[in-house]
């Protein structure tokens, strides 16, 4: 398993200035005569030799389980007494500002929005109207000027101070999503031809991926805000960081059972009878992503296992992994360790392949 990452296609979405209509609209609305500083980038990747749980895990982490940034308003930042357009409520404006796609690395930046409509027409407020009021001078924009934030009626104003950069993950708030539109398919399961779609299952496969064992996959996604001069560098960083996040989360599980002979609240290990051992491992703040990875790799390591399953407990913010197998306690922990090492090795190789494929 030396090369998992087989192929990658990186396609930025660029404005077609050769089209007179688009060119005139860009110039009239935004005074644009060249490409925007940040562009959406579609990425399509082919993987071979790994199970679907690994591809699904990479997909989930890239989308909403990796730290990212969004713009937010600090408490009291929305100046109610100075904002006279009743339709532009704080929650509406906050939501629009949250979802401005940004490329940020510096959390000390602070922006403000001070807009007044002195005209007789409705005024559109764009992200270009945000002004930087604190933090180091930007060498390159962190968001495009074209995102619609709201509207102002004639004679009305909107004043917002303390718009800051907030760090988080997408599963807590969708505005933190690093990637969007993620989807993947299996390339080694026979599909119905196009002219027979009326007879096929909704998946399009002749065999269910639940009963097959696909090892050739295609993953597609979109990064909504990537600096135009550094597209490949940014995509490479995102993919490598996702691999490292998965490796780090898996390695944290190793600490739970490394001293399995000593009592600890996260691990319950006991013999059910003369042959079977049961392990119950509680992992804090973990998700289906890691649960599915563990379950799949343990099954591959121990095909004759009696039982392996997991359950996420949302109100406790934890995941519970249960394993039952005909083995001693020591042997069961050894098999679990080998399964975890296989996961780590998979994503270490994948991280290495990223450097080889994306210059």
Swiss-Prot record:
Family of this protein: In the N-terminal section; belongs to the archaeal RpoD/eukaryotic RPB3 RNA polymerase subunit family.
Keyword entries, A-Z: DNA-directed RNA polymerase, Early protein, Host cytoplasm, Transcription, Viral transcription, Virion
Domain of life: Viruses
A single MF term (Gene Ontology): protein dimerization activity
Subunit structure, as described in the record: Part of the viral DNA-directed RNA polymerase that consists of 8 polII-like subunits (RPB1, RPB2, RPB3, RPB5, RPB6, RPB7, RPB9, RPB10), a capping enzyme and a termination factor.
InterPro entries on file: RBP11-like, RBP11-like_dimer, RNApol_insert_sf
A GO biological-process term: viral transcription
Induction context: Expressed in the early phase of the viral replicative cycle.
Name used for this protein in its record: DNA-directed RNA polymerase RPB3-11 homolog
Cellular component per GO, a single term: virion component
One of the Pfam families matching this protein, by short name: RNA_pol_L_2
Source organism of the structure: African swine fever virus (isolate Tick/South Africa/Pretoriuskop Pr4/1996) (ASFV)
């Amino acid at each position: 398993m030396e090369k998992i990452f087989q192929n990658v296609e990186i396609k930025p979405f660029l404005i077609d200035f050769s089209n007179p209509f688009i060119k005139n609209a860009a110039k009239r609305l935004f005074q644009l005569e060249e490409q925007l500083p940040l562009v959406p980038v579609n990425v399509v990747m082919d993987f071979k030799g790994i199970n679907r749980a690994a591809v699904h895990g990479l997909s989930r982490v890239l989308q909403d389980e990796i730290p990212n940034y969004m713009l937010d308003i600090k408490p009291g930042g929305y100046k109610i007494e100075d904002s006279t357009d009743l339709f532009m409520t704080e929650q509406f404006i906050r939501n629009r500002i949250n979802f401005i796609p940004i490329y940020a690395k510096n959390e000390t930046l602070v922006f403000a929005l001070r807009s007044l409509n002195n005209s007789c027409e409705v005024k559109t407020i764009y992200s270009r109207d945000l002004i930087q009021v604190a933090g180091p001078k930007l060498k390159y924009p962190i968001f495009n000027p074209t995102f619609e934030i709201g509207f102002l009626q004639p004679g009305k104003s909107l004043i917002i101070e303390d718009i800051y950069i907030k760090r988080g993950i997408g599963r807590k708030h969708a505005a933190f999503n690093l990637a969007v539109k993620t989807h993947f398919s299996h390339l080694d399961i026979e599909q119905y031809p196009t002219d027979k779609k009326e007879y096929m299952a909704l998946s399009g496969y002749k065999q269910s991926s639940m009963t097959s064992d696909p090892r050739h996959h295609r993953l597609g996604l979109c990064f909504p805000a990537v600096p135009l001069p550094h597209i490949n560098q940014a995509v490479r960083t995102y993919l490598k960081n996702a691999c490292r996040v998965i490796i780090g989360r898996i390695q944290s599980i190793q600490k739970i059972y490394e001293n399995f002979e000593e009592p600890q609240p996260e691990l319950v290990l006991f013999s059910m009878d003369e042959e079977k051992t049961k392990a119950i491992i509680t992992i804090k703040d973990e998700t289906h992503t890691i649960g599915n990875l563990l379950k799949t790799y343990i099954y591959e390591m121990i095909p004759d296992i009696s039982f392996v399953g997991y359950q996420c407990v949302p109100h406790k913010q934890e995941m519970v992994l249960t394993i039952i197998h005909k083995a001693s306690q020591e042997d069961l922990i050894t098999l679990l360790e080998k399964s975890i090492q296989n996961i780590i090795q998979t994503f270490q190789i994948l991280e290495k392949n990223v450097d080889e494929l994306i210059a």
